[in-house]
Amino acid sequence: MLSTTTIGFPRIGNQRQLKFAMESYFKGDSGEAELLAVAHKVQSDAWALQKAAGIAVIGLDGTLYDQVLDTITWLGAIPPRFKHLSGLQRYYAMARGGAALDMSKFFDTNYHYLVPELGPDVLGPATAGPPLQPDFSGPLDKLARGQAVVGRDGAVPILIGPVTFVSLSRGCELPLDQAVARLLPTYCALLQQLAAAGAPEVQLHEPVLATSEGTGMPTEFETAYAQMAQAAGSVPLHLVTYYDDLGAAYPWAVQLPVAAVTLDFLGPPGAAVPSQTLALLQQHGFPADKRLGAGVVDGRSVWKDDGTAVALLRALLDTGAVSSDRLVVTSSAPLQHLPYDLGLELEAPKTPEATAPAARAGRPPGFAKQKVEEIVSVARLAASPQPPLLQLVMAPWCSCSGCSRARAWRTTPPTSRLSGSAAKPYDVRARDEQLQLAAFPTTTIGSFPQTAEVRRLRQQLKSGRLTQAEYEGLIAGHIAHAVGVQEALGIDVLVHGEAERTDMVEYFGMQLGGMLFTRAGWVQSYGSRCVRPPLVVDDITYRGPSTCWEYKVAIPTAAQPVKGLLTGPVTILNWSFPRKDISRAAQAMQLGLALRQEVAALEAAGCTIIQVDDPALREGLPLNGERWASYLSWAVDAFRLCTGVAAAGTQVVTHLCYSDFQDILPAIDRMDADVLTIENSRSDKPMMAALAAAGYGRDIGPGVYDVHSPVVPSVEFIKSRIRSFVDSGILSGRYDRIWVNPDCGLKTRGWPETIAALANMVEAAAQARAELQLAGGAAVAPVTGGVEAAGKGGAGQCRRNQPLRGLLPLSCLP
């Protein structure tokens, strides 16, 4: 049997114990001791599970919020505004305080990390040493606890490598090599202490190597790893990479002074370009003095392996570059991106809402626990000359032939968009046919607080204690309340509050054909927030309106316009577990077509402003920049397929979450949305400056306060944000096209803080109008768009009818 290891596991617990412990601590209902007890138990259980499955060497994963924040803490790279605090108070202030660290997506995943700040006040000026205040108690304590659970020989610390850490940071004024050099003494000191504590090896995770930027960092890596290898002494260093192949970095990366290198042999599920790792190894070989960690069990997909893993391992052995005693089987990425245990799903009681995935298509998929077992099975089978259990263990489930019934027009890149009159450009439709609002119009992103009462109603519906009619009647009351609050506050464009939605992707997954959803398939998004990604198992089809009822409930109680709220096709795809038998592009087009029909249904119900959130657009970018153009082409086409049916008088809004957008602004412009709202509250001026410099010319809502913090922003704070938008020069002074809104949905906030924050937001917008001597007050200006204007151009007068490559044939459009 080949050796095995793990490089990460879900950190929240099999029943989300850590999530609930954190939330209790945040509310003040429990103390530090209770939180740590739960966290340590969750970690110990995960390590014990991996040991029981037969894993030889276990990566000691686990965090109280975020692994990058953990690194900031043990490095002592603390921004000055937090240094007056200590312990967990400081840790969580950096995560969710009033001036918290920025948040961004971790490479191309749906996990959010806290962005390190490495300016001169953290790393020190160029001529001085770093004022770091390292604290190694966390990593050393975790190692000691891991050794107690799995033994000294099997407990391996996991650290984010120094080059990746600096690459993830912001505010650093030093060149990359100098910034890394500032951190190396602290890394070396920790490695020495881990060695003294008996660590058998140390995993250093460097996913930046899989990016285009990483290929240009050989000097930084060689210098850093030479110093760390010397400091570690006899303790081996294990370089771990994942999320894609290393491309041009492979030849020099595998020669770094480490004892082992783990490589991703699979890449992103459904990617247009398959992983090139095996080809790179066949071309360049592999050092004879190193162990190879073969990431052949898919750590980002729930589908069972179809024999690919064993075939890859045998191909590796056949090259002669790696002997069986130097080959270690592992996952292609940390298993934190998967739900915890399929067994929990199969044991859950069946309800009208959720059915165990096995009920749909025979053999079930595998979650993190099953992937650990698969690692062991693959290691055993690959070493066997005649693996009799291969077909049994590796039988495909829905990842290949089981899903190949897609009609040609659903999987073949479509060729055209729609017929009708000539396109109306943004300036014409915005001026002549859409809502005309006061300067600095106010709105929210969509969701309002999800109270215990709302969650209880959903649970009662699932359990049969409420009928659908009873449930809808009670939800209608919550919608009326949300609308009433907004009108009382003077908000210009309203939302219904999304009381009926558990999650922006899961909700639509339940409404569309071809998708399955779970009851226990929770995955950490950030901190205490968890999501349940749907599983795409078949052609995605439209089964009827899913948002029109809520819109119609909101309208009678609203004097102001109400937005229709949808999740966009790329976000649904990127935040689901996609199929592997057809491309992601084909699945995105299926989603675009289905959502297109929902846009048409909302318009038919009288909706004249429709928000299609596609916050995951950027995170789906391939790590290799050479593959960006292809991805952005089909991703934007899918969005436009969804929204292109809207009339010129219907204002289309989109929302993009924590990401850096400067390098994809042309693609954002090609989306052709009338209003762009972005999660900019923690990024502040750089994003606005980039948009202004690029000549962005459509309506924009940059986000005036951070909804991820419970702190209520003051009127003056929000006003300062509005002034910064004006000062950026964006839109050349067209203040009527700068929207004032929170930076994201309000689902996780409480009602008191929500009302207080929104009241301050409305007042700040009114004061900004007055100070800039603009007309409009706090009320909505006369509407020249609206229901009457939606059909102004006559039947078939759609917003953007220019031909698009890669869209559906005319015969397929509704």
From Swiss-Prot:
L-homocysteine binds at I445, G446, S447, E498, D613. InterPro entries: Cbl-indep_Met_Synth_N, Met_Synth_C/arc, UROD/MetE-like_sf. Keywords: Amino-acid biosynthesis, Metal-binding, Methionine biosynthesis, Methyltransferase, Transferase, Zinc. It comes from the Eukaryota. Signal peptide: none annotated. Pathway: Amino-acid biosynthesis; L-methionine biosynthesis via de novo pathway; L-methionine from L-homocysteine (MetE route): step 1/1. Its EC number is 2.1.1.14. Its cofactor is Zn(2+). One of its GO terms (biological process) is methionine biosynthetic process. GO terms for molecular function: 5-methyltetrahydropteroyltriglutamate-homocysteine S-methyltransferase activity; zinc ion binding. NCBIfam families: PRK05222.1. Belongs to the vitamin-B12 independent methionine synthase family. Catalyzes the transfer of a methyl group from 5-methyltetrahydrofolate to homocysteine resulting in methionine formation. This is 5-methyltetrahydropteroyltriglutamate--homocysteine methyltransferase. It comes from Chlamydomonas reinhardtii.
